[in-house]
Amino acid sequence: MDKIEVRGARTHNLKNINLVIPRDKLIVVTGLSGSGKSSLAFDTLYAEGQRRYVESLSAYARQFLSLMEKPDVDHIEGLSPAISIEQKSTSHNPRSTVGTITEIHDYLRLLYARVGEPRCPDHDVPLAAQTVSQMVDNVLSQPEGKRLMLLAPIIKERKGEHTKTLENLASQGYIRARIDGEVCDLSDPPKLELQKKHTIEVVVDRFKVRDDLTQRLAESFETALELSGGTAVVADMDDPKAEELLFSANFACPICGYSMRELEPRLFSFNNPAGACPTCDGLGVQQYFDPDRVIQNPELSLAGGAIRGWDRRNFYYFQMLKSLADHYKFDVEAPWGSLSANVHKVVLYGSGKENIEFKYMNDRGDTSIRRHPFEGVLHNMERRYKETESSAVREELAKFISNRPCASCEGTRLRREARHVYVENTPLPAISDMSIGHAMEFFNNLKLAGQRAKIAEKILKEIGDRLKFLVNVGLNYLTLSRSAETLSGGEAQRIRLASQIGAGLVGVMYVLDEPSIGLHQRDNERLLGTLIHLRDLGNTVIVVEHDEDAIRAADHVIDIGPGAGVHGGEVVAEGPLEAIMAVPESLTGQYMSGKRKIEVPKKRVPANPEKVLKLTGARGNNLKDVTLTLPVGLFTCITGVSGSGKSTLINDTLFPIAQRQLNGATIAEPAPYRDIQGLEHFDKVIDIDQSPIGRTPRSNPATYTGVFTPVRELFAGVPESRARGYTPGRFSFNVRGGRCEACQGDGVIKVEMHFLPDIYVPCDQCKGKRYNRETLEIKYKGKTIHEVLDMTIEEAREFFDAVPALARKLQTLMDVGLTYIRLGQSATTLSGGEAQRVKLARELSKRGTGQTLYILDEPTTGLHFADIQQLLDVLHKLRDQGNTIVVIEHNLDVIKTADWIVDLGPEGGSGGGEILVSGTPETVAECKASHTARFLKPML
């Protein structure tokens, strides 16, 4: 079996295609966005490979696995078990970190448990248990003739007169003791003060160091250890300042007796109670009610709503504030910012123990007076948040919560004991906070001695390999402690790719979805090297990809097309790259051979130095106090290697600030910055990302873009509808009335099968049309509402040509290249690139003011060369209306058409975070320090 044969694949829009795919090769599937690449790679090949493997398991095991739907295909042979690495599923679990996903943390836990050296957190001395022979040898290694005494500590730093203890010691025959550092006779002990802390050590033996003492010393040590419960001190008799030798037979700190259980891997896991910091439960952050969120606008007065829910409108709470104002003599009508710090403290944190006279008035106007302390607004919110049963109250209060690093563990997530175990003077949290590149250096230079080297050998190999794979997929800038929620789709995908290589499987079919997303050209070669490595192990690697380098590196290319959606689903060309270039119908071939290309614009829009948006002192994540200057009304690209700080600067700093000031939204807290100027040039900010436009099958392009409302109004205006009294609501499949109630307007009914995938069967009442018979009797221009929803955008544009409002909205969907999706197509079936373009179309169809700030993060994801051309036309059109466009992008075709580039770097992670150069593409291409310039120059 050296090939995979597919016959009659009809999944989604595939048109009954037949394919022969060579095994153990690197195969790139390419084509327009929406042409059916994912349908072939994921929904047919992967789904079938996975399904066959899972069906070989017992029925009992199958119920725990989510089964894939059986693809609509006549026959596939030559499949191997399949593993898919997609972008979607990043973990939203706050306990997942880069270290735990890659399993490096598990190996680190093992390493620290087996060769770690525990130390005392207070005295920084190694905890060690010694045998009597080791103690004797240590004493005998002192210079010969030295006068020493052996002490057994009985009482350490405890208050009291301790007369009983001293009498007991004397009665046991001991003559001397050292009390608080002074040696005295036990026959006449000093009187100890009751309120002071005392230390009492018994002198067990006094001797001069010489060779024949071994037996005597061993007996003395045994006595001393028994008396003291496991510790002994050897002190110099002549020089009281000399350093004393501390011995312990327990696994403990010889100074304070701090001891810990035997080291085991779970002590280093922050997801296990044995290792997690008890304050934050191993999350590394604590939630608290943030005064800055509670008081959004310090210019308002308390009466005017400085604290939401505590103003005039809320009678009960406002009475409390008024009584508080009478007591502390402040004015509830004065702006919050003008009140004294003490008033701020009382209002937010309460009056402590001080009783205050509160006047309460009930609905009838009767006043009652009660005296009690004021709990404070923040404490009140905290209490209500903990006690409430209502999810609405909890959601409302959650808006005021922020996170801060846990004070006990300083954000390391581990308990105190685990933070004080060292390997080569480095504790575990220090390794987790290193970037992966640094960690790799650390382990390469780690030299352990003797037995420890043998124990650690295998563990270190596993850690080293995994770090190396992460570096090879371009993730050297991440830290192991980075939370999984903060990773971008491309990063998460490449982490999973690295852990797959770490697994070293052979004979598997890997299906990858655009692994180059979010990767700078510089890291691309390493990524391709990784894929080729997977192939050379003996795996079939199938990649859905648009990247030119990937297509050139492939052994076998499959070009799906010729168009998208209903116009796609056929194999236009397949074979090595030369064969693809020779097929005139293949768009991919034309772009690869240079017959078509994305042109560099003839002239760029010059920047107007008067009109700029200036953000100063951005310091989020790895940004090093940078100042960003964006020309207003231009198409700007933010570039830089992965991890250089692009997303932090734009998505985490600029966007939240602009959102607060322009849209009045209070969603996200911007990363730290000093100042921003120039927002007055804009009236709104819009972020167009690739998140799905709706998570339910009921959401679709028609409802999202607002096309559906006028369509329903048209249907409600038909004479027949008016005669029956139908309103536009009758034509909605989301409300009772017009929809089919058997399937509640879904068109399908879900049948749960416990050992097989859930089956969706068309509803037998409406035959999948979503509406009841009466609604479907109404026709507009001869079509029912169901037939309209079933039209592609292109057909609908023609059909509604006479309705200008609809025609305009549909035209914008066509402008962004979505001619082929259906109006009623479920949002869950759209790809990321398609969802993003539906959003773009929605923005385009609004009447533009020409003063909008658009922010796009890697809009070329999932787009073919021809799609990128269309996207650029749309973005340039938006710019020509005077809008400002900021795009984070790695794609050189987009970068070269920008008016202005801001390049961050020079490296990722701690090696980045500076703005290297900003200016026109021609200026940037000349910058020696920039990695982007190196790749951009040949394009211009």
From Swiss-Prot:
An example Gene Ontology CC term for this record: cytoplasm
Residues the record lists as binding ATP: 31-38, 640-647
Chief site of localization: cytoplasm
Zinc finger intervals, C4-type: 253-280, 740-766
Keywords: ATP-binding, Cytoplasm, DNA damage, DNA excision, DNA repair, DNA-binding, Excision nuclease, Metal-binding, Nucleotide-binding, Repeat, SOS response, Zinc, Zinc-finger
A Pfam family assignment: UvrA_inter
Localization (cell): Cytoplasm
Gene Ontology terms describing biological process: nucleotide-excision repair; SOS response
MF terms in GO: ATP binding; ATP hydrolysis activity; DNA binding; excinuclease ABC activity; zinc ion binding
InterPro entries per record: ABC_transporter-like_ATP-bd, ABC_transporter-like_CS, ATP_grasp_subdomain_1, P-loop_NTPase, UvrA, UvrA_DNA-bd, UvrA_inter
Keyword Lipid metabolism: no
ABC transporter domain span: 310-587, 607-937
Matching HAMAP family: UvrA
Function: The UvrABC repair system catalyzes the recognition and processing of DNA lesions. UvrA is an ATPase and a DNA-binding protein. A damage recognition complex composed of 2 UvrA and 2 UvrB subunits scans DNA for abnormalities. When the presence of a lesion has been verified by UvrB, the UvrA molecules dissociate.
NCBIfam families the UniProt entry points to: PRK00349.1, uvra
Quaternary data: Forms a heterotetramer with UvrB during the search for lesions.
Family note: Belongs to the ABC transporter superfamily. UvrA family.
Name the record gives this protein: UvrABC system protein A
Organism field: Escherichia coli O6:H1 (strain CFT073 / ATCC 700928 / UPEC)
